[in-house]
Amino acid sequence: MPKEHKKRGRREDQKKRKRDHDDESASKRSRKEDVDHVQAENPLQHVANHVPRQDAAPFYGMLDEQEQEYFKKADEMLELNQFESPEDRRIFLASVCKEAEGKELKMATSQTSRLLERLILLASEDQLKSLFQTFSGHFLNLVQNRFASHCCETLFIKAASAVSQENASIKTEALNTPPASDPDEIIVSMENLFLYTLGELEGNIGFLMTEKYASHVLRVLLVILSGEPLEKQAKSVTQSKKKEKVTVSGAGDERILEKRVVPQSFLEALEKVISDSVSGIEPHYLRSLAIHPLGGPTLQLLLKLELSHFGKSRAKDEKSIIHRLLPDNPIAEGTESAILINGLVYDSVGSHLLETIIEHAPGKLFKQIYGEFFKERMGSLARNEIAGYVVGRILERLGKDDLEEAMRQIVDQIPSLVERNRTAPIKTLIERCVAREVDCSPIKAQLETAYAGPHGFEVTRILKLNEDDGKPRARHGESNEKVHGSLLAQTMMTVDGPLGQLVFDSLANLSPELSIQLARDGTASRTLQAALVSRNATVIFRRKMIQQFYGKIGELALDPKASHVVDAIWYGTVGLAFIRERIAEELAENENSLRESQVGRKVWKNWQMDLYKRRRNDWVAQARTTAGNEVFQSFPDESQSDAAAPARNHRTSRHMSAIELARQKFAAAKAAQAKDGKKPKKGSNRTNGSSETPKSLVAQ
């Protein structure tokens, strides 16, 4: 009897379906429990729940497959920018813009938003206004969308400059791409379009401050309203570090905004946003917002704009952000304000808010906070990885007497700071001591001991170089340590005295192999570049340092990192014309390899090697003029102005070598002979290669 036909593996399928069902149920339970747990722990959820907003974002439709493929190819072509002529590019852009008409919302909420960003960067003022009107009524949903939020951010930044131009009555020239025309369209100013957008977001600011995507757009909008420049650092408070940078050839760097004059309506709107953002939040929820990963940076920006644009007297206003954060007067231990400050010091997010308070707070409030919480703790706080940056902000506001006291505390911790590779407080301390004219000798003594090696102070220990394997050490977190070490060494060299001389002497005593390694290291080479162009570097140091690279200039000029050192040698050969010619000869010997390399071509251009090859005499004359007259001046006489002498000899007045001292003594004897009436014979030459004092120097 034939058996019933059954599918093979049915038992496994049943088991798999059962496992999947159990996993899904467990996952749902787990997610629900996680949400409940977060809601219980995060008091900010209470604030968000009281903000009226739509439960589900509207659906704007999807592009069909042909449209998606077309826009994808258009995006690739704009990115590559391989058009045969500008006219072809203009025609292509016109066709893309025409195809995108009426589909802007679909594009903004899908992966084709990258193409829309590029089109915004290339858009004219009329096209920007048209897109503003298309997005009008949808901004609250768009700023919360993963893709559309980037389009809104780009649109705001691009349109911000147009506001200033409109107010200055400057008519901008339209781009080649014609805008979409509608006979029923009502043209409004860019200023009003921004204000309409704010009107859409009004009442939702508290929620948007902590929204994953909208919080970044909100910060950009606040900066635009204030007229402040838009920061573009990696850790800028206005932008996520994960944001992809979308660019397009021909648009320039339109994402950078300089400081601008904004209309009064913008400042009034900004003041209202600052007031509304915290008006409905209880004080304990506001303090929780200070340590929120998304709300914290927004609160920092609001506080900074409040104190910098509307006067530090607002600290007395009970409705201001600073007063609501720190309501107690005086701020004493045990108060709510004291609890907040002590909690922010060691928090990775909250410490940034505390830095903002310290930087922008009124003088009376700062002195109160410093005296109560930090004056006796500067040394211990400097050792902490997070609190060390707060210490740096405090040092920037201290007077000379308080700075000397803080220096004594921090100097005792320098060995511990060096051991932990936390050199940022030391760098800031040196900078402030120089600015306040505080003696740096205690810092020099501690650093000399902390970075001591078999041959005394070793700059390679600051720069984290390993002489044995010829490569930088590979270990976790070394990148930041190397950057901070390089910055510390560069700061030390700005000090005219024993502290800076530690670095110069150590660099001059490096072996040729280690000097080459230093030049090839991307981070450490910046210290070498700074040393070669430093005003405190003596002629002897620069000569000894540059001679370490003889025979290797061609190789270094081809290295992406070391090529910058070769460029710095041009400025480092001031007063060393013969060394400059020696380096140029070595570059000329490697002409073929340099011309074949993009890096090498830049070095060739910076050293003016085409002039060297074609008209060598002109190059030599120019090199000797720029490299010789800066330091090796003609001997002074009575015809030269006494006031001009220090300016002409600013290098020789510092760390004078034996030969320079001898020249100075000879010049003094020469001046004494002139006073006695003894003149040199006519035609005699007592100067370095010139028969008379240059007229330009006398004129000075």
Curated annotation (Swiss-Prot):
GO terms for molecular function: RNA binding. Keywords: Nucleus, Repeat, Ribosome biogenesis, rRNA processing. Residues 10-39 have a biased composition (Basic and acidic residues). Its main location: nucleus. GO terms for biological process: endonucleolytic cleavage in 5'-ETS of tricistronic rRNA transcript (SSU-rRNA, 5.8S rRNA, LSU-rRNA); endonucleolytic cleavage in ITS1 to separate SSU-rRNA from 5.8S rRNA and LSU-rRNA from tricistronic rRNA transcript (SSU-rRNA, 5.8S rRNA, LSU-rRNA); endonucleolytic cleavage to generate mature 5'-end of SSU-rRNA from (SSU-rRNA, 5.8S rRNA, LSU-rRNA); ribosomal small subunit export from nucleus. Residues 1-53, 631-700 are annotated as: Disordered. InterPro entries: ARM-like (IPR011989), ARM-type_fold (IPR016024), NOP9 (IPR040000), Pumilio_RNA-bd_rpt (IPR001313). Residues 631-642, 685-700 have a biased composition (Polar residues). The keyword Repeat applies. It comes from the Eukaryota. Gene3D superfamilies: Leucine-rich Repeat Variant. Pfam families: PUF_NOP9. Pumilio repeats lie at residues 200-239, 336-371, 372-412, 509-547. Residues 664-674 have a biased composition (Low complexity). It is found in: Nucleus, Nucleolus. GO terms for cellular component: 90S preribosome; nucleolus; preribosome, small subunit precursor. Belongs to the NOP9 family. RNA-binding nucleolar protein required for pre-rRNA processing. Involved in production of 18S rRNA and assembly of small ribosomal subunit. This is Nucleolar protein 9.
